Amino acid sequence: MTSKVGEYEDVPEDESRLTEENVSVPEEEVEDEDEEEDDDDDHIYINEETESGREKVLVSHAPQERIVPPLNFCPVERYLYRSGQPSPVNFPFLLNLKLKTIIWLSNEEPQDTLLEFCDTHRINLQFAAINPDAGEDDNPWDGLTEHSIINVLQTIVTQENYPLLVCCGMGRHRTGTVIGCLRRIMGWNLASVSEEYRRFTGSRGGRILVELLIEAFDTNLVKIDKNKAPSWLLTALE
C-alpha cells in the first residue's frame, strides 16, 4: 500500500513539472519578440515617393552631418533656386546642389564665410548691386533698380550659369522682385506672380511698390538667346 501511495504522489509532481515546462515556452517566445522590437528601434524609416506611390523606406544610418537649407530656400525651376543669405550651417546643403553660380542682391558684400565658401568650391559669386549710384547715406537694402534686375535676369536666362542660386538678406523682397520679373517673362499672370511673391514675405506681407515694379517691368528688355537658354524657359515661351 505504501508503494502505491508513493506512485500516486509522484503523478502530481510530474504534472507540475510538465506544467512549468509548458509555461516557460511562451515566456521565451515573448523575450524573443521583445528582442526583435528592440532591434527595430535601432532602425530609421523615412517616407519616400516611388513609382508605385509613397512607401516606407529603411535607412540604415542617420546622416553624419546636418543638412539644413538656407532661410526661405525654394526651388524655382530646374537647377534654379532662391533663398536668404546662406550661413555656414547651410554649406553642406549647398554642396549637394553642385552650384555653379550664386547671385547676391545687395550693395553690401555678403558674410566672409560665404565668400570663402564660394572661393573654396569655385562657385561664381555674382554681385548684383541694387543701386550702383547709391551714396553713403542711402539705405543699402532699398529695392532693385530696373538696370540691376535686367543684369540678373540675363544671367538667369543663360544655361551655362547653372545650377544657380539667387539670394538676398532674407530671401524675400529683392529675391522676390527678380523671380517675379522672371515669371512675367515666362508668361505668368499677375495674380499668380503676386501669390508666389507673398508666400515668402512672412506675416508682414508684401510691399506694394515691389508688386508695382514687377507689373510695370518691360520683359522685352531681357534678351534671350534660344541656343543658350534653359529648356524650361524655352518650354514656357512656346
Swiss-Prot record:
<dbReference type="GO" id="GO:0005737">
    <property type="term" value="C:cytoplasm"/>
</dbReference>
<protein>
    <recommendedName>
        <fullName>Putative tyrosine-protein phosphatase OCA1</fullName>
        <ecNumber>3.1.3.48</ecNumber>
    </recommendedName>
</protein>
<keyword id="KW-0904">Protein phosphatase</keyword>
<feature type="modified residue" description="N-acetylthreonine">
    <location>
        <position position="2"/>
    </location>
</feature>
<feature type="domain" description="Tyrosine-protein phosphatase">
    <location>
        <begin position="72"/>
        <end position="230"/>
    </location>
</feature>
<keyword id="KW-0007">Acetylation</keyword>
<keyword id="KW-0346">Stress response</keyword>
<keyword id="KW-0963">Cytoplasm</keyword>
<keyword id="KW-0597">Phosphoprotein</keyword>
<feature type="modified residue" description="Phosphoserine">
    <location>
        <position position="24"/>
    </location>
</feature>
<keyword id="KW-0378">Hydrolase</keyword>
<feature type="active site" description="Phosphocysteine intermediate">
    <location>
        <position position="168"/>
    </location>
</feature>
<dbReference type="GO" id="GO:0034599">
    <property type="term" value="P:cellular response to oxidative stress"/>
</dbReference>
<comment type="function">
    <text>Putative tyrosine-protein phosphatase required for protection against superoxide stress. Involved in cell-cycle delay in response to linoleic acid hydroperoxide (LoaOOH).</text>
</comment>
<comment type="similarity">
    <text>Belongs to the protein-tyrosine phosphatase family.</text>
</comment>
<feature type="compositionally biased region" description="Acidic residues">
    <location>
        <begin position="26"/>
        <end position="42"/>
    </location>
</feature>
<dbReference type="InterPro" id="IPR029021">
    <property type="entry name" value="Prot-tyrosine_phosphatase-like"/>
</dbReference>
<dbReference type="InterPro" id="IPR004861">
    <property type="entry name" value="Siw14-like"/>
</dbReference>
<dbReference type="Pfam" id="PF03162">
    <property type="entry name" value="Y_phosphatase2"/>
</dbReference>
<feature type="region of interest" description="Disordered">
    <location>
        <begin position="1"/>
        <end position="43"/>
    </location>
</feature>
<dbReference type="GO" id="GO:0016791">
    <property type="term" value="F:phosphatase activity"/>
</dbReference>
<dbReference type="GO" id="GO:0004725">
    <property type="term" value="F:protein tyrosine phosphatase activity"/>
</dbReference>
<dbReference type="InterPro" id="IPR020422">
    <property type="entry name" value="TYR_PHOSPHATASE_DUAL_dom"/>
</dbReference>
